[in-house]
């Protein structure tokens, strides 16, 4: 549904990184943002992982570098808080605030510089926009991404993204 983003180490500090000539090596941080189209509808998912002997794109990661692990855990918790905040009747900016406020409380507010999410449907970016300015009231059946991130220029970036659908009692991860 879009050109994938594949970024290694410091290149992952760019939210919409372009390819570099750097080769992936054991111990590198790898960020992959990709999606497919099925019956005209888009999908979108981002994972950040350590490329080592235990390489996987699951949400549980074990970085040997303590700072990478700390940032990863903050982003993972921010995403969980945002997903837990999803409920019909809430405004999009309330979902954004759940992730953004947590990241800011950990001291990385300035390193999270994009919206928390966007609608996903026939187009990869559509309403509702899950951002500070998002005034859209969530309704059952709305589908959007939840993708907080922390980006440390010259070092690395971490983003975790899932697409959710608003259900009567909260979010369902697709």
Listing of model-derived features with the role each one plays in the protein:
Residues 1-174:
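Active-site neighborhoods and metal-handling regions in enzymes and metal-associated proteins
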